[in-house]
């Protein structure tokens, strides 16, 4: 009997140990199981909207007061009626005007939606589990028309989810309403657990990593009504280029290693990186960011991610233009910089240091490569005064070496 007990116990504890090994392997590959979402699925973490009768009423004419204001993805686009929380409309292509809300609802992301008969939501019919189709993951894919909806009436606002690689580097312990600036810098996602940003942004945080965090998938900083939530991560290491000069901002590049990988979603993806020494010549590059003073601001329309289209400026012209400024005739543009802009009223001058400058891939214009990192400039949006950016192509080999030294794959910013 004792022998049988020992054998049984051996199998029980052996199975438990084996399961632990398997669980550890799963976590190693996918991250925490609670964070892993297979492609084709999503987790909605929004708070319940409450009873329908408590929602603001809307409607015009005969429907006046018979409809309710509800977030856009809770309204069926075909029947124009409210759906249960378990059913989320992800196929709508609404057009929202962020300047004038003509649908009577307080938020531009709310719609005036009809109530089901009797005011009671139908119980969703059970459906068999859907086996997700694994879609290939590509870097540099821009959602030009946005996700779910397209906005009108904008002034340089990006569409929702337009640039999935955009990341905000934030102070971790800002008290809401304190007036303290929350945004430290911008950045770009180059791998699930790696953010590329400017060294000048994070140099002072190397010994105080708990003071900052990153946020990916953000768009409008004053609402969480978007269908896809943003994701935040802590930073476990800051890697600054060893030759970074804080006084001249030469070699202004840094990598932020996250405490765990971000989960890929339609609003979160990576940007492609250029080959070493690659040169860009394009009028269709973009820079994006919120602006340090505008992030989370209550000033109207300043809370949505901005974009600005900029032309590249070749090195000789950029240096000549900058010599006409207070820099003087002896100024020499370091090879670690590239230039863009120089058009009246178009510049990255709102405190968006570390944010990406990206251009169409010359071999595949439907994808984007990161040309630069917002570094410095003279004035703001003046004619013939280009903005200056860290030259990402100059640092490609350095980025690869740092990634490989940490055992991280370079594939997410190549394919």
Curated annotation (Swiss-Prot):
Glycosylation, residue list: 32, 89
Protein name: Phenoloxidase-activating factor 2
Annotated disulfide bonds: 58-112, 69-105, 75-113, 139-272, 185-201, 285-359, 318-339, 349-380
PTM comment, free text: The N-terminus is blocked. Proteolytically cleaved by PPAF3. Cleavage produces a light chain and a heavy chain, which probably remain covalently associated through an interchain disulfide bond.
MF term (GO), any: serine-type endopeptidase activity
Domain notes for this protein: The clip domain consists of 35-55 residues which are 'knitted' together usually by 3 conserved disulfide bonds forming a clip-like compact structure. The clip domain interacts with cleaved PPO1 and/or PPO2; the interaction results in PPO1 and/or PPO2 activation.
Gene name per UniProt: PPAF2
Binding positions (Ca(2+)): 218, 220, 223, 226
